[in-house]
Amino acid sequence: MSRRRAHDTEDESYDHRRNKRRRVSENQEIEDRLESLILRVGERSTSSVESNLEGLVSVLEADLGTFRLKILRILSDCAVRMPEKCTVYTTLVGLLNAKNYKFGGEFVDHMVKTFKESLKLCRWDAARYSLRFLADLVNCHVISATSLLQLLDTMIDVSNEDTVPQVRRDWFVFAVLSTLPWVGRDLYEKKESSLESLLLRIEVYLNKRSKKHHNALRVWTSDAPHPQEEYLDCLWAQIRKLRQDNWAEKHIPRPYLVFDSILCEALQHNLPQITPPPHHDNFEYPMPWVVYRMFDYTDCPDGPNLPGAHSIERFLIEEHLHHIIETHHRERKDCAAQLLNFPFKHKIPLEYCIVEVIFAELFHMPTPRYLDICYGSILIELCKLQPGTLPQVLAQATEILFMRIDSMNTSCFDRFVNWFSYHLSNFKFTWSWDEWDSCLLLDAEHPRPKFIQEVLLKCLRLSYHQRITEMMPTTYAKLIPVTPVPNYKYTSEEAANLPGTTVALQLVGAIRQKCTPEEVVNILKEIPSSGYSGEEMSDGSFNALKIDVFVQTLLNLGSKSFSHSFAAISKFHVVFRALAETEEAQICILHNIFELWSSHQQMMVVLIDKLLKLQIVDCSAVATWIFSKEMTGEFTKMYLWEILHLTIKKMNKHVIKLNVELSDAKEKLSKADSSSSDTDEDTPHKRKKPITHADKPSEEVVERMEEKLEAANVNQKRLFLIVFQRFIMILSEHLLRSDTDGRDPDTDWYRWTIGRLQQVFLMHHEQVQKYSSTLETLLFTSDLDTHILEVFQQFVALRA
């Protein structure tokens, strides 16, 4: 009997475990089904949004007892991750609150917690979407208007904080302003005086805030035909216009209006007192921006009108399109399809809105959110999906950009060149060049001919020289790039008179015979130390002729392709390192690369990048070479600044990498110490796996890492000091010479150069910011010319 009972017990235990697994599996299936239903509510289907909501409320109400926490989590996630469906989800919550007041209160608490956590973790978009959701719950009779106004007032209190960055105060004001389109009408009807008081406080703040940063962020220096408005000023103008219209807007779908008779019977909840977390030095706030405008209603003659620049609909449409790009930017085809499936496409000139928003992203200052090619590839997909209209709108936009290029920001000029050349390469390089031939009468440094020349140089990278020559009208001959071939002087007509010719020819033979680096060194020993007596670059600390012969000969032999050049550099890396012991020697190497490859800009860019990666030349040497007298004729060409920026980025990445490694090492060391002490105290069954001795870095290793980081920071600071000092020198010299000669200093050269200075500040703002006090003390002092000093002050104001 005992055996039988034991057997029965085992069967019962097995059945219990099987039933438990089945229940877990069934619960998981129900949870997945609920999540799918919630995520898809309001999307296009055969039934209306309202009937979808009614059906979903019935399903959720039945499952609240079992899956309450899961439903709370999904709904709060949707509020943050799907802001375009905000009113659909607030209506859903409102209907659930009308049926189950307790659940409504729990959801409000959950949403408040999400909002507070987002603020604490500096998730600014998530915080703004959470605030918007809470505000829209007022429309659904879930939250009282009084408690929402208290929250908005508390947020505006931040604008009165002292000793905090303006960008913090700006964000809280922006968050409140951007919420008002959803709830303004309800507040106006129920609490008009409180709403007016809130708006007055916002106006007082906006009138006194500094806008020193504004000019640094403009796409164009001119306000004709469209003003370049600072984002808070623009949104404030849109809110004022909305107030004039009695808070009636035409864009936001409001499904809760259909259920008003149900919702108005529900009891409301009061928001708790919410205090924004205080400022900490490690908090990073969104930087200000300028609202980009390319079109107005006169540019889109057919179909629906484009909303005015100060209509709230323009803000709502643009924000929605920006969010679509943010959500789908990794998949260009999906992104293009989603943009063209914009919910209100029949009410607006959609193609114009999309093109304007994409260029707003591309030209966003200080840097775009994503790579330039991301926007280019999305535009190509849009042209494929909408071939009847979008290419024409894009051509119209390109024409507008070209006509306004005279006053375009230098960074945006570069992005325009990169986008247009990439776009042409995907459409057989077809363009109506004859319409732009008036630019051929302008000075070569003028932005219009300069743009075409730079576009052709970029097209050359994406094609070949003969193709570029064939695609251009003969009138553009002077702007067509020269054939990119090496200029190897040791086989030229004057080679017999050059001091290194004999050794160069000997070196050619040896390298072709696959000689070793040691054999190359021995051949170079035949060049006497004083062999370059007539060369001003040689100061006695290195042999310039050895560098000349070796670099030009080796790279000429590897000139067939990038791969051949890289292989040559890698094979004779030791020789390069031996010759490049000093910064002067490294500059001499760069001089010889330029002398050999002056007609092939891309080759120079990739070779210098390779030399930096292999640590043959230092970043400071590249910066010094760029500002040398030899490069004066190249100073306004894009490739030179491409080299400077890749050099600075290389240094920045190195510093960031060392920072991360040091932080990880310190964290491991700290965890190892705490783990060893915890292990002694824990009981055996609770003991965690301690960090092993192999994982734990020693104190000496951490100290060495700190020393490496300190040295890297010193080199980074030195690099920025070299760059900014050289800028100041050449700009000051130009301004002084113009003043002495009685000439207008505002030349094309000056605008390019001051634009490049601004570009360095903005493109590398995160790293430069660390040294702003040093730069202010050593370089950007009060006695500096105001034109140069303003660029620095505008940069500092970005995070002030």
Swiss-Prot record:
<dbReference type="GO" id="GO:0005634">
    <property type="term" value="C:nucleus"/>
</dbReference>
<dbReference type="Pfam" id="PF09090">
    <property type="entry name" value="MIF4G_like_2"/>
</dbReference>
<dbReference type="GO" id="GO:0031047">
    <property type="term" value="P:regulatory ncRNA-mediated gene silencing"/>
</dbReference>
<dbReference type="Pfam" id="PF02854">
    <property type="entry name" value="MIF4G"/>
</dbReference>
<comment type="subunit">
    <text>Component of the nuclear cap-binding complex (CBC), a heterodimer composed of Cbp80 and Cbp20 that interacts with m7GpppG-capped RNA.</text>
</comment>
<comment type="similarity">
    <text>Belongs to the NCBP1 family.</text>
</comment>
<dbReference type="InterPro" id="IPR016024">
    <property type="entry name" value="ARM-type_fold"/>
</dbReference>
<dbReference type="Pfam" id="PF09088">
    <property type="entry name" value="MIF4G_like"/>
</dbReference>
<feature type="modified residue" description="Phosphothreonine">
    <location>
        <position position="9"/>
    </location>
</feature>
<keyword id="KW-0597">Phosphoprotein</keyword>
<dbReference type="InterPro" id="IPR027159">
    <property type="entry name" value="CBP80"/>
</dbReference>
<dbReference type="GO" id="GO:0005846">
    <property type="term" value="C:nuclear cap binding complex"/>
</dbReference>
<dbReference type="GO" id="GO:0000184">
    <property type="term" value="P:nuclear-transcribed mRNA catabolic process, nonsense-mediated decay"/>
</dbReference>
<protein>
    <recommendedName>
        <fullName>Nuclear cap-binding protein subunit 1</fullName>
    </recommendedName>
</protein>
<feature type="region of interest" description="Disordered">
    <location>
        <begin position="669"/>
        <end position="698"/>
    </location>
</feature>
<dbReference type="GO" id="GO:0008380">
    <property type="term" value="P:RNA splicing"/>
</dbReference>
<keyword id="KW-0508">mRNA splicing</keyword>
<dbReference type="GO" id="GO:0006406">
    <property type="term" value="P:mRNA export from nucleus"/>
</dbReference>
<dbReference type="InterPro" id="IPR003890">
    <property type="entry name" value="MIF4G-like_typ-3"/>
</dbReference>
<feature type="domain" description="MIF4G">
    <location>
        <begin position="31"/>
        <end position="243"/>
    </location>
</feature>
<dbReference type="InterPro" id="IPR015174">
    <property type="entry name" value="MIF4G-like_typ-2"/>
</dbReference>
<comment type="function">
    <text>Component of the cap-binding complex (CBC), which binds cotranscriptionally to the 5'-cap of pre-mRNAs and is involved in various processes such as pre-mRNA splicing and RNA-mediated gene silencing (RNAi). The CBC complex is involved in miRNA-mediated RNA interference via its interaction with Ars2 and is required for primary microRNAs (miRNAs) processing. Also involved in innate immunity via the short interfering RNAs (siRNAs) processing machinery by restricting the viral RNA production.</text>
</comment>
<dbReference type="GO" id="GO:0006370">
    <property type="term" value="P:7-methylguanosine mRNA capping"/>
</dbReference>
<dbReference type="InterPro" id="IPR015172">
    <property type="entry name" value="MIF4G-like_typ-1"/>
</dbReference>
<keyword id="KW-0539">Nucleus</keyword>
<keyword id="KW-0507">mRNA processing</keyword>
<feature type="region of interest" description="Disordered">
    <location>
        <begin position="1"/>
        <end position="26"/>
    </location>
</feature>
<dbReference type="GO" id="GO:0000339">
    <property type="term" value="F:RNA cap binding"/>
</dbReference>
<keyword id="KW-0943">RNA-mediated gene silencing</keyword>
<dbReference type="GO" id="GO:0003729">
    <property type="term" value="F:mRNA binding"/>
</dbReference>
<keyword id="KW-0506">mRNA capping</keyword>
